[in-house]
Amino acid sequence: MTKREILQRLKGQLIVSCQAYEDNPLYGTENMVTMAKCVLAGGAKGIRACWPENVRAIRALTDAPLIGINKVMPSADTDFYDSVFITPNYESAVAVIEAGCDVVALDGTLRGRNEKELTELVQRLKAAYPDIVLMADLATVEEGIICEKAGFDILSSTLSGYTRDT
């Protein structure tokens, strides 16, 4: 699919997040595939999945637009509200792109980095993967303005409530 086709298929549609942490009974790739089957059967037109192994398995199931994230959770001594953890760097983005996502969602907040670093990450990904759709997970209007200028294709308020500013 082209970027335009992906964006058109997602516009105004239900996107369901299929993810679970290790301490959740639904944790595991097999369960995420089952969850994806259920949400698609229920009418979802897109899926958001975490970690390369889940993205790869769900991609094998469907050609529905797939948003990939690669959470890198902060260490116990790092404050959650100060951490960039949703696809925080180039390597984590490449892992879910190579696993088969159509859209890669990145942390679009400025926690732990500045606007220039975020813009450079976007430019590097666009140069290496010109057909991938880039989604900014952000928390504030100000971050939305910065992310739009940086070149993200989709802006989402996913992190509202998960940062010190919100």
Model-derived segments and their meaning:
Residues P130-D131, I154-T166:
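Catalytic-face loop-and-helix region of soluble metabolic enzyme cores
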Residues K3-Q8, K37-L40, V55-D63, I97, ...:
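Surface-exposed amphipathic alpha-helices with a cationic face
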Residues C38-A41, G68-A76:
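Metabolite-binding pocket within alpha/beta catalytic cores that recognizes anionic/polar moieties
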Residues L26-T29, R48-G68, A76, V84-P88, ...:
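Active-site-adjacent beta->alpha loops and helix N-cap segments on the catalytic face
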Residues M1-L26:
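N-terminal amphipathic alpha-helix/helix-capping segment at the start of soluble metabolic enzymes
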Residues E91, V96-G108, G112:
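Ordered, amphipathic secondary-structure segments that act as subunit-interaction surfaces
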Residues L14-C18, I47, L66-N70, V104-L106, ...:
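Hydrophobic faces of well-ordered beta-strands that scaffold small-molecule active sites
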